[in-house]
Amino acid sequence: MAQRALWRPQATPGPPGAAAPPGHRGAPPDARAPDPGPEADLVARIANSVFVWRVVRGDERLKIFRCLTVLTEPLCQVALPDPDPERALFCEIFLYLTRPKALRLPSNTFFAIFFFNRERRYCATVHLRSVTHPRTPLLCTLAFGHLEAASPPEETPDPAAEQLADEPVAHELDGAYLVPTDTAPESGACCALGPGAWWHLPGGRIYCWAMDDDLGSLCPPGSRARHLGWLLSRITDPPGGGGACAPTAHIDSANALWRAPAVAEACPCVAPCMWSNMAQRTLAVRGDASLCQLLFGHPVDAVILRQATRRPRITAHLHEVVVGRDGAESVIRPTSAGWRLCVLSSYTSRLFATSCPAVARAVARASSSDYK
């Protein structure tokens, strides 16, 4: 373990009782004291789990990358939580890459400084391979190998000094990312993300029930979500939401952005409030009843979710996911017209798994050895 590699900033020296400047989260190098460092393979595992890195600066002698991702269990071992409650479930990582002549590094090997939530740093030498996004040079994936702890430099860069872009450069959810499919192999090897939405463990992809374009055109103006959970939440959640029904925070991990309205709306975690928080499967229609016609051929007073979260199964039959109930207690099957079982690409699936704490938590739990 590299005891000198991981550092935690201390308070900037100043007069007794002086407050830190607004937004201050770092400190100059001489104010830093070493903390015990994690194993190099832990940092390598974290770095290689990052979905997308966004270029902050690409100078000839210094390259700076940044990513945002859900705060995972490995990250909790190296990163302090962000004090902002809206950001506490996420981690911001800065990566500085240089090739100091004094180190005589081999080809494709760099001196790297990782900053985790701007509070802790890890210095290492690392062999690096990169793949640029097909539509923009500002996004890439990085593969880290032979990561070895290194002594920190005398001068440490300050992430707060960097100018960060606040607009997306890739619009992954604007295209036809919902691809109709039949069913999944090993359909029981999955975990539930929402009603009619599953993470397929062998393939690492999301399957979900969604409307086709013709049916989607009948949705309220401005709504871009098409998946079943979103529609059911609009039908059953009371107007205004709020409290326990308020939407959870999301980021855009594909663009390293804190604001992510498109990701939050389209995320398969969007589901009826009473299902998400109380595990109720019979839900009264308390929201926009006019939207029921997108799912049922007859009026209904309630919807019934037929799959238990403990033993989910990806199904190509919509009535195995949801049915309605009318005032006479009769069961109303959903109409199949306009609805398709869809699969998301591995890329888009990872976007949601690294942007949504609920999806990340469900996948991690299902992937663990003790999941039953």
Curated annotation (Swiss-Prot):
One Pfam family cited in the UniProt record for this chain: Herpes_UL16
Organism superkingdom: Viruses
Region of interest (Disordered), ranges: 1-38
Stretch forming the signal peptide: none
Keywords: Host cytoplasm, Host nucleus, Late protein, Virion, Virion tegument
Entry-linked InterPro entries: Herpes_UL16/UL94 (IPR004286)
Subcellular location: Virion tegument; Host cytoplasm; Host nucleus
Entry keyword annotation includes Nucleotidyltransferase: no
Membrane recorded as keyword: no
UniProt biased composition (Low complexity): 20-30
Entry GO CC: host cell cytoplasm; host cell nucleus; viral tegument
Role played: Plays a critical role in cytoplasmic virus egress. Participates in the final step of tegumentation and envelope acquisition within the host cytoplasm by directly interacting with the capsid. Upon virion binding to target cell, a signaling cascade is triggered to disrupt the interaction with the capsid, thereby preparing capsid uncoating.
HAMAP family for this protein: HSV_CEP2
The protein's assembly and partners: Interacts with cytoplasmic envelopment protein 3 and with the capsid.
Family the entry assigns: Belongs to the herpesviridae cytoplasmic envelopment protein 2 family.
Name listed for the protein in its UniProt record: Cytoplasmic envelopment protein 2
Organism: Human herpesvirus 2 (strain HG52)
